[in-house]
Amino acid sequence: MNSSKNKILFRCDAAYIPEIGSGHLYRCLTIAKLLKKKFKLSNQNILFIIKVSKKFGLAKKIIENEKFNFIKILDHKIKNYSDKELKIINKFSSRLIVIDRLDKISKNFILRLKNNYKKIILLDDASNNRKYADLALNPTILNVERTNNCKIGYKYNIIPSILHERKAIKKKTDGFFLFFGGFDKNNYTKKIGDILLKLNMNSKIFINSDKKLLFKPEKRTKILFFKKKDHYKTLLKSKYIISAGGLGMFDGIALNKALICIPQYNHQKKNINNLEKRGAIIKLESKNKKKIKELFINLLKNKINLEKLKNNQKKILNFNHVKNNLLKISAVYEKN
């Protein structure tokens, strides 16, 4: 592959592994698509470096579907920010490199990256070495030291829903949209889906078609299964979103939906607790089926003030915030 053609390189992963999932890759894909459009780039100008073996096969599956070029890291045991990883990344060069992962970059690693990459952007890095990057965005990892080049807070997120037109839906929104990320570690889709089905309600239940076999044939007839390509179309026409605390949750906030969240991992739990305190979401305790059932019944009977929740969401993350973040990223790319 001709390294001179690369304008932007992304280093991120997606995996059927707790704390990784698919959000980091989808966030990078969102940036890639928007920069491609803004700067009239081709897919040949954009390169992803991803792990592909074993549980990291999720990344390969997603990237191939999106038709971007990618380099495979075949050894899934290579550690983040190790000399081995640096050797692979520095086989290439580009105007900009974007690294998206929950980790801490070392000073040695980022300074040696500068030999091959003019500009560096970090997403959700937790180290003090973020100060050596041209831009660091921390929309979900918030307990970090502030630096001049770092923006910290939920409003600095990049979410895939920005790519999809928010067409006005004339019909009243209805139904529960269930989505627990690229890796539903705790099988919440099945557990919550079963609770909703037992309510025998008139409201629709929307679930991705790749989860169809989780449900018995007689239950499948009561669920509206959507294809992956219709994810955001279905999301827009849903009234309630039930999600984990990943990128899907932030899509729900920006889309101003009635949002019910169950944490899958520790960092998600922190954000969900914080957002609940700020009145932007409804938190669910997954182990208490009785309370979950009561919540759904109260929602359907309009006993919960959703307007207040939606007003609080607008202050936390909206599409103007996302557009401003993309302008910041574009400015880094353009700067000599």
Model-derived features: where do they sit?
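A donor-sugar binding/catalytic signature common to diverse glycosyltransferases
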Residues: 22, 229-271
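Conserved donor-nucleotide binding/catalytic region of nucleotide-linked donor-dependent transferases
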Residues: 282, 287-316, 335
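Active-site and donor-binding regions of nucleotide-sugar-utilizing enzymes
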Residues: 10-19, 27-38, 51-65, 69-146
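Nucleotide-sugar donor-binding patch of glycosyltransferase catalytic domains
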Residues: 257-291
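A nucleotide-sugar donor-handling region in carbohydrate enzymes
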Residues: 131-187
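Donor-nucleotide binding loops and adjacent catalytic segments primarily
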Residues: 174-239, 249
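Short internal beta-strands
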Residues: 45-53, 205-210
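C-terminal alpha-helical cap of glycosyltransferases
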Residues: 318-336
